[in-house]
Amino acid sequence: MGELLKRADAYTLSRTRKLPDELFTFMAENGFFGMQIAKEYGGNPMSTQAKSCIMAKVSSHSGLLSAMVVIPNSLGAAELLGHYGTDEQKQYYLPKLASGEFIPGFGLTEPTAGSDAASIKAEGEVFKDSDGEIKFKLNFRKRYITLAPVSNLISLAVRLHDPENLLGKGEDAGITEVLLEKGLDGLHIGDHHQPIGEHFPNGPIVGRDVIVPASNVLGGEEYTGMGWKMLMEALAGGRMVSLPATGICGIRHGAMIAGAYSMVRQQFGIPVGRMEGVEHKIGKAAGMTYAFDAARVFGCSAVDKGIQPPVTSAIMKAYSTEMGRDT
C-alpha cells in the first residue's frame, strides 16, 4: 500500500484523469484488482474489514486511484461471478478481472433508477435466431456508471421480456444480470463525466439493439430473472464496504487537517486550537470520526460473518457520505 501511494502522484492523476500504465501494472501485479477473487482464479482474497481499510487509505490520496480500487473490489462482476457464476464463466472472467485485463463497470443506474433498482427501464427481448439459438436484444440507457469510460466488461441489469416463453419463466422473465464485453455492435460507452466535480472515470453506457446469447446471463440461463436477488445481496455488502470507507476517510481527513491547522494558527499569542469554541468543534469532529469508524468495523465484521445487513448498510452509506461531504 505504501509503495502504491508513493508511486501515485495525486496532482498528476487529477490533472490528466488517467492512470499511468506503469501504475496500473503495479496494481495488477500486487493484487489490487483481485481482493475478492479466490486464489484459484489468480485473486488476492481479503476480508471485508481489510478491503475497507485499504479503500479508505487509497481514498485519502486520490479520487481516481480510489475508483480503480473500489469498483473492482465491491459492486460488480467479480463479486457476482464469485457467488453466482457458472464454472465456465468463473474460469473465463475471474482470472482476467484479477489481472486487470478486464476492467468492470456496474450497469445499474439510469435516469430514473439507481438505489431504487426495481425501477430500471433497460429492456431485453428474448428471441430465437435463424439457427434456433436463444438470444437477447438489449436496449438501455445507463448513466453515472463509475469506471465506464475505461471499462471493457459491463454487468448490466436489464428487465427481460419473453413473449414466446422460450426460457420457461413466463412473458415477464424479470430483472436479469447480463455480461457485456466492449466492442459489441450497438454498445456505446460514453465520454468522461464529472457528476460531482471529481476526476475519477464516470460516464454513460447506451445500448441499441445489442444482441447477446442467453449464455451471457450471469450464472447461466437458470439465473434468468434472479437479478433483483443478486443486486440486493451485492448492494447490502457493497454499501457497507466501499462508500462508508471513502466517506469516513473524508471525515478523518478533515478532522486531521483542521486539528493540525488549529495548533499552527495563532491569535492572541496562543494556538486557536486552545480556544474553547474551536476546541469544541475539533472535539466534535474527532468524536464523529471515532463513532463512524466504529460503525464501519461493526458492519464489515457482520459481512465477514456471512450476514448481509441491508438496513445497516443503507444507513452507513447515507450518513457516512453526507458527513464526509460536510466535513
Each predicted region: which residue ranges?
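Beta-sandwich/jelly-roll carbohydrate-recognition scaffolds of carbohydrate-active enzymes
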Residues: 92-96, 108-127, 143-144, 165
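Flexible, small-/acidic-enriched active-site or ligand-binding loops
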Residues: 185-211
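A glycine-rich, basic-preceded beta-loop-alpha segment at the flavin cofactor/substrate interface
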Residues: 206-239, 256-273, 297
